[in-house]
Amino acid sequence: MNPPRTLMLAAPKGHATTRGKRLRLRDFRDAPFIWFHRWANPVYYDRIMQVCVQGGLTSPRIVQHVVDQATILSLVSCRLGVAFVSETTHWHCPRGVTLLPVVDLDFPLPFYLIWRKDDPSALLQRFVAQVEAAQC
């Protein structure tokens, strides 16, 4: 397993709520959110809602439900709202979007690699070796 990734706030660059301060969940009580559908991953959905409630974001104002992070980032870049995304999305973030840490958003995202041990593929073995070498 690689070290867990964290969630970040994706916001349009220059968004009023994000200027010059340490961000907390409660700062986004009135912000429009772009959110993923609960049916896509009920456990993840319920857990992130629980973390939000604990941080004072008791009822996120969800203005759009989507199914993937690419769509989330596109809608954030169109200034439709803000969203929580994996920190790894910085590799393909649109220019108009900034990723910001939220100090009380404690929600690690573990990454696991699963493969069949009896698969003799040399390509698979090299891939697994690369992933293992990348672990910190």
Predicted regions and their residues:
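Beta-alpha-beta core module
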Residues: 1, 5-6, 70-118
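Flexible hinge/capping segments at coil-to-helix
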Residues: 1-7, 11-33, 116, 122-125
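Structural motif corresponding to alpha-helix initiation and N-cap regions
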Residues: 22, 68-69
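Secondary-structure junction motif
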Residues: 32-55, 121-124
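Short beta-strand-to-loop elements that line the ligand-binding cleft
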Residues: 59-68
